[in-house]
Amino acid sequence: MASQGTKRSYEQMETDGERQNATEIRASVGKMIGGIGRFYIQMCTELKLNDYEGRLIQNSLTIERMVLSAFDERRNKYLEEHPSAGKDPKKTGGPIYKRVDGKWMRKLVLYDKEEIRRIWRQANNGDDATAGLTHMMIWHSNLNDTTYQRTRALVRTGMDPRMCSLMQGSTLPRRSGAAGAAVKGVGTMVLELIRMIKRGINDRNFWRGENGRKTRIAYERMCNILKGKFQTAAQRAMMDQVRESRNPGNAEIEDLTFLARSALILRGSVAHKSCLPACVYGPAVASGYDFEKEGYSLVGIDPFKLLQTSQVYSLIRSNENPAHKSQLVWMACNSAAFEDLRVSSFIRGTKVIPRGKLSTRGVQIASNENMDTMVSSTLELRSRYWAIRTRSGGNTNQQRASAGQISIQPTFSVQRNLPFDKTTIMAAFTGNAEGRTSDMRAEIIKMMESARPEEVSFQGRGVFELSDERAANPIVPSFDMSNEGSYFFGDNAEEYDN
């Protein structure tokens, strides 16, 4: 991207850093990962989990959620002020799974938030270590992106459910900072802005007074984040219009919906980071690996290497396929929910299949599910090759895609053509070209019209053998262009509900 020079790298966002060189970035990301690992080891000790139970992804999710809840200032304050029956605002907890006489049992644990915060800070040299908290939020977000297609959320705001490839990070909390903003898709930002504008339409005081001023600042900041994701001047100019509007209303909602659609072809830059569950970092630290000393990157070979040697287990329901559960988690670990399945399959070395064909539900187990029939199995999270994660939309071109999803958002920097259904997308652009933004709209539509399906994105970029740590010998894969590339194809994925 042209403005790359003014941007901080993800690692800098991740670690709240000022400009750092590559070694310093690797060290500070390593420090963050090491902190998560140390915290996890300590929590396993507190909860008396044995090695196997500590590597169970469901236990990892509960422990991660406990620390995120302990540090959720706004919610904690809200809970203190609005006490609800049977909920202690000072406590946090969740289901912990243990093996008792050859059967898996669920045990609900409860801890003081203060105690959890103490353990977390102790593991992070006394710091609050917000970067580590954000890292866990992004892992949860990537898992949600892989598990659920946000059809309802899209429809509610008047967008097409087939635009799901724009929805990365849609379940990230607002407090996820710059690192969180970097991984949010164009659709996610548009959704947040539309919700805000709708509130303003319904509530006359939304933009008024001292609170209204803060709201306005937040609105403009979100507009700027979204503007920064677009790669064409016309899209950015339209964002300026939306941001500068005196009184945001339906015209702005229309402009935003238009921009979201345009992003299916003129894709935005969305960062991708491999964020792994805490139960991967814990055992690595326990085995004596020093992340800070060795350095770590979320966008290079490191997460692949870590997953090659990690043992992670998962509870499996009686009608689920363990291989399918593994695929779900592999995609989440690599932030590949909206990647082309041809590319994911090549990197993983086994066929990655669409969501609707997976016999697996989400990773979390609901409190009313029967534990008697639960078994556990090893998650297969290894890969055949590794590839660099991209933060660009890889725009040059396009191609046909599927019924359930009409575009993709690339994760890996690997040469290929990008599938999307041009006729379907362009059909949405008939009619309405009047109003303030008509010239920009016309220009955007022209760029979309001229996009050529045959062109190749990420020219010359390839995948690498796992032994090729320096990324010296790229292997440029060739893909069957006629093949289907979308994950949420024809979709019967579950709906995500908070």
Swiss-Prot record:
Keywords: Capsid protein, Helical capsid protein, Host nucleus, Host-virus interaction, Ribonucleoprotein, RNA-binding, Viral nucleoprotein, Viral penetration into host nucleus, Virion, Virus entry into host cell. One of its GO terms (cellular component) is host cell. The keyword Cell division does not apply. Pfam families: Flu_NP. One of its GO terms (biological process) is symbiont entry into host cell. The keyword Ribonucleoprotein applies. InterPro entries: Flu_NP. Residues 8-21 have a biased composition (Basic and acidic residues). A motif (Unconventional nuclear localization signal) lies at residues 1-18. GO terms for molecular function: RNA binding; structural molecule activity. A motif (Bipartite nuclear localization signal) lies at residues 198-216. Its main location: virion. HAMAP family: INFV_NCAP. Encapsidates the negative strand viral RNA, protecting it from nucleases. The encapsidated genomic RNA is termed the ribonucleoprotein (RNP) and serves as template for transcription and replication. The RNP needs to be localized in the host nucleus to start an infectious cycle, but is too large to diffuse through the nuclear pore complex. NP comprises at least 2 nuclear localization signals that are responsible for the active RNP import into the nucleus through cellular importin alpha/beta pathway. Belongs to the influenza viruses nucleoprotein family. Homomultimerizes to form the nucleocapsid. May bind host exportin-1/XPO1. Binds to viral genomic RNA. Protein-RNA contacts are mediated by a combination of electrostatic interactions between positively charged residues and the phosphate backbone and planar interactions between aromatic side chains and bases. This is Nucleoprotein. It comes from Influenza A virus (strain A/India/6263/1980 H1N1). The gene is NP.
